[in-house]
């Protein structure tokens, strides 16, 4: 297996808690993510959660990103905390799409910068019907 670092990412899109990097794994561009640890030392199990969510979505025939686990020792640039695995997914953005940051999306939708991004996001989301009634 051939693994090479392409780009180490900042952690802005996950509240700054997950270490991420883009790697080429056997010629395929992949996003590799570690796990979190909070100020009290509580370890997050995000790699396992992402793989479980991916598997559930697959069973339910939802469109989804397919995540899988790999041994963290192959990815020294991705920080992990007391786990042996990282989550991995292949590059997922089609060539004819443009990536827009959450920050820019909110400002474009509202035409101003909100004081509370979470509240702004809730206003922008379409109303969701409950799944179970």
Name the predicted role of every residue range.
Residues 116-133:
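Conserved kinase catalytic-core segment
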């Amino acid at each position: 297996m051939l693994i090479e670092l392409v780009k180490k990412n900042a952690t802005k899109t996950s509240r700054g808690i997950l270490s991420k990097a883009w790697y080429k794994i056997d010629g395929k561009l992949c996003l590799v993510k570690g796990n979190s640890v909070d100020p009290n030392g509580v370890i997050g199990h995000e790699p396992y959660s992402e793989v479980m969510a991916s598997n559930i979505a697959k069973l339910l025939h939802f469109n989804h990103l397919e995540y899988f686990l790999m041994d963290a020792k192959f990815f020294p640039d991705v920080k992990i905390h007391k786990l042996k695995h990282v989550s991995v997914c292949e590059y997922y953005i089609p060539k004819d799409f443009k990536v827009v940051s959450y920050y820019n999306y909110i400002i474009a939708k509202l035409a101003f910068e909100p004081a509370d991004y979470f509240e702004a996001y809730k206003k922008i989301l379409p109303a969701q019907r409950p799944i179970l009634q």
